[in-house]
Amino acid sequence: MNKKKMYSTWFLVPAMIVFLLIFIIPTMASFFFSMTVWDFKNWRFTGLDNFIMFFSERSLNIGIKNTLIYAVLTSGIKVILAFFIAVFLTGKIKTKNIQRSIIFFPNLVSTMAIGITFTAMMHPTRGLINRALSTFVESKINWLGNPDLALFSIIGVDIWKGLSIATVIYVAGIQSIDRTYYEAAEIDGANGRQKLFAITAPLARPAMNSVIILSFIGGLRSFDLIWAM
């Protein structure tokens, strides 16, 4: 038994060495450097002064608040909207393959290109969006220049971009549901809404959990789209 344990341990050694070199050592080095002030020539140990200065920054609270609003709204809307789109795309429609391709298209475009395109579309005077709304709204809306609208404008673009991946995950989860559940429900006289909330939604929970995690993490670490816009 001891020989078998030693034999299996030797197989773990290469992975442990790689993990140590790639993760543990850089993490410890980063923590040490965070407590110093240096310019690649001279360095001085400062303890927790850098952390105190960071958390005493006035704009930190605003940044954290906006980041949480961004992550919660983008992930929440993606989770709900992508689910209903996936339900529609897995239904009995003739053009569902074409529509799935259209839904997935935003994921093929780079984030910077999307940001630049929507920045042009949201221009207060020359933008396509304001031109389309000119029939209903007389004043020009400054989508990205107004502090009250800028965050929500970028949130809308992020939702448009991220719906594709969320929908694909939902489609895969819904298609993996055993069809016998739906057949049994139809025999019992269940309608479409009852099957949706009693069968599809509960059994698609693993896919929903994946969408929630990926969308929320993506919202927290989003930078390129915000920078581009």
Predicted regions and their residues:
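A structural signal for multi-pass alpha-helical bundles of membrane permease subunits
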Residues: K3-M229
